[in-house]
């Protein structure tokens, strides 16, 4: 637990004023994920996608949909519509399951310019975040937040400081 809390603390320091959130439950067994989520929050993360850890330890539950959520729908539009219907426009939509540019366009069409956020989980995160920010702004979604995920550590977070990223999902 102390190794996870220490790593989380280093990531929070590298992230500066951008929040870090635990999304590591997909990478380890169930009970290790619960312990790691608690340790990450002790290290400064602002919440966890692990609902059991949130319940057991009174942590803030956060999260977005996974790629499998999009894949079980007929298309991205229906996946986004389902998520927005269930969680409201302030939700964060995962936009890199297929084609990022098309997904961002669809996300704003479905949720409107009040869309809470988008998540990018693959590719060159800095370059992709810049392209997505430009596209969101052009579509009128100027307040939509960008979260990036995918094998992040303190070095990756430091390298992303100049990118238009609002938060990090780690794990």
Where are these regions (language model features)?
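Buried, small/hydrophobic-residue-enriched core segments of structured protein domains
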Residues: 1-143, 152-159, 163-164
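Short hydrophobic "strand-cap" motifs at the C-terminus of beta-strands
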Residues: 149
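Glycine-rich phosphate-binding active-site loops on the catalytic face of alpha/beta enzymes
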Residues: 166-171
């Amino acid at each position: 637990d102390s190794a996870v809390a220490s790593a989380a603390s280093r990531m929070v320091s590298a992230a500066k004023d951008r929040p870090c959130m635990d999304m590591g439950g997909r990478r380890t067994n169930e009970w290790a994920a619960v312990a790691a989520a608690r340790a990450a929050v002790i290290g400064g993360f602002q919440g966890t996608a692990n609902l059991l850890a949130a319940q057991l330890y009174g942590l803030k539950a956060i999260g977005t949909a996974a790629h499998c959520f999009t894949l079980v729908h007929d298309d991205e539009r229906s996946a986004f519509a389902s998520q927005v219907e269930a969680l409201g426009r302030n939700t964060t939509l995962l936009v890199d399951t297929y084609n990022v540019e098309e997904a961002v366009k669809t996300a704003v069409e479905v949720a409107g310019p009040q869309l809470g956020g988008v998540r990018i989980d693959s590719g060159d995160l800095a370059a992709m975040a810049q392209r997505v920010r430009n596209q969101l702004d052009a579509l009128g979604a100027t307040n939509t937040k960008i979260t990036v995920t995918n094998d992040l550590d303190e070095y990756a977070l430091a390298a992303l400081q100049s990118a238009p990223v609002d938060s990090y999902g780690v794990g």
